[in-house]
Amino acid sequence: MKKIMFNDKYGLTQAVLEGRKTQTRRIADTAGRLRDITVRQALEEVNKGRACLFDEGRPLALSAYKLGETIAIAQKYADLAYEGEFFRLLGKVIFEKGCHNKMFVKADFMPHRIRITHIRVERLQDISEEDCIAEGVWRDDNVGLEGTTYWYHGLANSSFRTPQQAYASLIDRISGKGTWESNPYVFVYDFELID
């Protein structure tokens, strides 16, 4: 089983577990090789269920996850202590790297999973208002005369007028400054929590 990591600093793992985040974008590795880009579902049996970017008829980038695939949500072993799962793992985990770094956890030990329900490819800046909310951006209608504002966890005392502005700020903090401006192709995964 594969695992997937969501950013904890901006509360995205918790948003998935609470059902507020049901979509994620992952940058397609095209390494500047684009000429005549097309997008379609991969037809080969070995890649069935994956989205694929093609350039001049050759496969260029394949989605990491397949449609219908079940994926473990990576969490630090130490965080699982609060969910009662740590005791199940105690003798095995206490000295492992994954205790405080979820990059090193084993997928089979993770108590929460998602299932991929839809995959598509688009440019990062093509994200809709609804998709920004599905990505974990909060909508706040209680701001008095200013009207609706948008924000995300981990950014104190700041709000944005559109969900796209909030998401642009979030993706630049997660993936590096300039990510939004570079407008890369991304694999968009819709998912459901199944634990």
Each predicted region: which residue ranges?
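Secondary-structure transition motif
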Residues: M1-D195
